[in-house]
Amino acid sequence: KDVVLNYTHTPIYDGFQGISCYNRETTWITNNKTYEDITTVVPLKNSEDDEDVQSVVTVSMPIEDLRTLVAHASGYTAKYSLSSMVGESKAFVQMKERAYRLARNKNHILLQGEAGIGKQRLAHGIHMASMRMAGPLISINCADSTPELLEQDIFGAATDSDVSHPGKLELASKGTLFIDEIEKLPSSIAKMLAKALSEKKTHRIGESLERSIDVRIIAASDANLRRLTEKGQFDEKLSNIITRSIIRVPSLRSRKDDIPMKAVNII
């Protein structure tokens, strides 16, 4: 196997005096690694009316670099820092200190606590304090769609023989994927996700081509994930991957002294 082309040739823009440019995803498969490039092809003519292409200009860049640029342009970046989270109660300070420590290691992280206590904001802060802060932060909620759509959203899909779309697992490569309400992730998808994270490879639904990924998961759960796993209600392999580092987010009622400060911060 030398080169595999994903047959994508959609016009990107009319540039260079109205000449259409075309985009191709190119996958180079070697014995050691799979490389993915995005190649832009610009056909050059003597004039706009000339039908004959005299030459072409091609520009290639690693597809992960392009996805990072697109992610930032699309707003897939952290909006909150850990320092923006206010509170002086002992439970809050300890949680924040642990978040700073865990942000700097390479483990996946589970945020555990009641709904509405700021787990998503905490995920933003951890990403911003991590070594992946220059990469994208992409979010997904397991309760927001059907299992079929959720599967495609995470892994991507080939919609027909010519068109293939990346999933958020790919788009978050070199960055962080925040998975909210992960306890509601269907078992079949949980098994696929555990396999992808273990092997650091994924494939889009409807395709067999494997793509390398480098992504950190920050998951959030309202429930005790380890307890659900013990009861057989959550995939054990995925649980083992994401529960190595747990941050328990204290409820607001357990830190009533922080309420006035939070109110001022909101105002």
Predicted regions and their residues:
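Conserved AAA+/SF3 P-loop NTPase catalytic/coupling segment centered on the Walker-B
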Residues: 109, 145-152, 169-199, 215-219, ...
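Dynamic helix-loop-helix/coil hinge segments at AAA+ ATPase domain boundaries and subdomain interfaces
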Residues: 71-96, 148
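Substrate-gripping "pore-loop 1 plus following alpha2 helix"
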Residues: 161-164, 190-211, 220
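Conserved ATPase "switch" residues in P-loop NTPase domains
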Residues: 16, 103, 197, 201
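The cytosolic transmitter module of two-component sensor histidine kinases
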Residues: 8, 81, 88-92, 186-190, ...
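Conserved post-Walker A coupling segment in P-loop NTPases
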Residues: 84, 98-162, 170-186, 251-256
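Nucleotide-binding/hydrolysis machinery
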Residues: 130-135, 206-216, 223-267
